[in-house]
Amino acid sequence: MLSAFAPSASAAAPAKPYDFNGDGYVDLAIGSPNGKVGKKAGAGFVSVIYGSAKGLNTAKKKVFTQNSKGIPGTAEAGDNFGYSLASADFDRDGYADLAIGAPGEDTAAGANAGTVTILWGTRSGLTTLAGSSAEFGDPGRNHRWGESLAVGDIQQDGSPELFITVPGTSMFKWFYFRPPAAASGAAVRPGAAMEPGGAKALPRRRGGVAAQSADDVNASWLATGDVTGDGHDDVVYAWHDADWPAPAERRGFVVLPGTAAGRLGDAVSVVFTEVKSLAVGDFNGDRRKDVAVGQSSAKGGRVAVFPGSASGVNSATRTVIDQDSPGVPGAGASGDGFGTAIAVGDVNKDGKADLAVGTPFDEVSGRKDAGRAYVLFGSASGLTGKGAQTVSQSTKGVPGASEKNDNFGFGVTLLDHTKDGRADLVVGAPRENGRDGAVTFFKSRGKAGFLPVLSVRAVGAGTFGVKGRNARLGGVLGR
């Protein structure tokens, strides 16, 4: 089920993702799927804080729940509203919109059918204006519609598509957004604006291994980008067996090519490997997106990068980086979780993507599971450990202190919150102050990266008025 609420549309240049008020500063969306709403545990909520020249502006923030006026449904225990987030200017009105997954939502179709809700951007930010809702697809009992979300443009026609996983069916589906004529001035009717695009199933066999039933497979992550370099976004779709750890032949990712017809072609790459986090970015500047996967179950954890090419990706050319790689500070230890979270952005404005890597279970200053985050830099030869940087709550200039079980690094983003063309770092620590959580903003220094710390700001549950509600801020970050 997908519900959409839209204000009137007007002719404007599309906004960057997560720029909800169209001012050029990228904003931060934080999901709290386990958050308590009233007496409803795990109902979930989403907190938004707006960007500014100085970074995250604590004076401008908002919390959305399914009890917020204008949002469909009602906050119920276990809905997990905010489990997944994705953003694009769906109606191309100059303000980014936000898609929110609630995979635990019970519907008429059954328990845990799941829903996806879109909140619309305006000059004043995200809105919950009342309007008509729309339902698409056929989520059923335990389908967990919306467990993962991604946005791309497989047609390259300027209209983004929204991709939604339906793990209970081992599939994902996508929808086109068709904005109304700018001259109409009428409110968008979501039933006419959102069009089903199609569905794809994941491969469930390798060699002689028999296909599994849909109930035995969990579609886990989605990412988009032009991996093949043909000008169309491709979809990278990762899955794992419902049992964990999954056998080697029952986990991995596929690359599905986009086309001008708006359809996804057959997989150009099928890679069987561990995937615990997923991102795409052009790390070597060749105008093809590379696929990065976090493999945090390895000793200490690692990140594997598969370079893009006209024929997809090739496992033989992958690069693996961990805490023991040349140039990476520190050393890996069992259970550190390097690669639990990853995010792509251009920190130094050199035209090559860089990668933030969360290591939330690293021991810091003698504090077990305090956590840290790393930044790895792109180069002409691809992602490298050379010049890598790490930050924690023990880093000079960072508010607070590294404490046991903070899990600093459980979530990471690289987005340009200050509108200077350089990606800033946000690190989530969902176990800060118990289960309140916090996020810490680091302003990019350009070629110098993030060290020494230039401008940093920590934002906790008190800022949003959600103390004591199991917010776990920083566990889910819009990226």
Positions of predicted regions on the chain:
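Blade-edge motifs of beta-propeller repeat domains
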Residues: 1-16, 50-80, 120-144, 176-217, ...
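Hydrophobic strand positions within the blades of repeat-based beta-sheet folds
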Residues: 28-30, 46-49, 64, 81, ...
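Mobile, glycine-rich extracellular loop/lid and propeptide segments
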Residues: 31, 77-91, 95-105, 110-121, ...
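Short glycine/acidic-enriched loop and turn motifs that connect beta-strands
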Residues: 34-39, 104-109, 168-171, 240-246, ...
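Repetitive beta-architecture junctions, highlighting loop-to-beta-strand starts
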Residues: 44-46, 59, 114-116, 170-172, ...
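Long, internal scaffold/assembly segments composed of regular secondary structure
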Residues: 218-311
